[in-house]
Amino acid sequence: DRTVTIHASPETVFRFFTDSARWAKWWGAGSHLDPRPGGQIHITHPGGIESAGEVVSIDAPRKFVFTYGFVSGTPIPAGSSRVSITLSADPAGTRLTLVHELPDAAARDEHVQGWRFQLSLFANVVSDEVNANGARYIDLWFDAWAEPDPIARRNMLEEIAVSELRMPSLSRC
């Protein structure tokens, strides 16, 4: 089992398992999926290595299950293992738990580093999408604090801040 916290809502995280373009962002160019039970999954790894499988089940935004293996058959044949990804709400965003059912300990050991890398990459790809407008929000934040009218300043800040954030003072942070 592998667990990682993703700083985004479960709904946002889940889209990366049901949108082929987002799937390719964390698996690599040429990777794609047909997001429905029975739909095909294809992953293009560096060096021309390919993996394939199919979607087993989708329970949005909680669980995504698919089969997995290598087109070459080594170390495991295409579609011969099962990957279950479970998402749950977490105070920091989403807790993602991945379970990869493999035929033996040797196959499991061969995938430990790969999943560690993929989940780290996944967290970064989701973060990049969630924070895509970060620079714009920073500019808007400074524009708001440069606004001399306190009512206009509050309105500007409320436009860009999360709803849980309340400004105790209109004259300072």
Question: Where does each model-flagged region fall?
Answer:
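A solvent-exposed, acidic/Ser-Thr-rich amphipathic alpha-helical stretch
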Residues: 10, 29-44, 51-53, 59, ...
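Intrinsic-disorder/low-complexity, polar/charged segments enriched in Ser/Thr/Lys/Arg/Asp/Glu/Gln
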Residues: 1-3, 40, 50, 63, ...
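A short, structured loop/turn motif at beta-sheet edges
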Residues: 10-11, 56-62, 86-95
